[in-house]
Amino acid sequence: NYYRMSDVLLTSAEESKRSERFRKSQDNFRAAAKLNPGKIEVITVRCGDQEYDGYFCHPVNPKPGEWPAVLFLGGADAYAEEIYFGGKQMLDRGWAMLLVDTPGRGSSMYLKGIKTRPDYEVPGKACIDYLISRPEVDANRVALLGISMAGYYAPRVAAFEKRLKALVAWSGCYSILDDL
């Protein structure tokens, strides 16, 4: 939505507006989610003494029984609300999807001041724990998808997380200095 895109265009002099813009963007997504054909639940994932905001998205027209599920992590400046659209086709194909503002992203960054961290297997494990705790999720069919910066974090999570059955690491760039 426009509030999300306005964040990209803010100058350093307008830094104080980021939290307000984020909150409006989040409010817009949550209002639209109520109209979505598949259920989108607002959830929190606990990790140590921190809580991360996110969404558990139900598949559209799910088959009977437990659902396969994917944890979808966005890049360095991504919001859970914006990456929903990149994963929507998984919902259409019968997968559940967990979107979480892990450290350094979305509400963790803008509303809670939680910065990113190098040991991403820790928040990654907390997210997988949450997914597997859901009775409708098939614990034997859990995948992780990381895009952009999370395309680097996702393999680290997978290296420590043996419950994952699939990994997609869609990294941003190979060498940022070469790509500039």
Where are these regions (language model features)?
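Hydrolase active-site cap/lid region
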Residues: 159-180
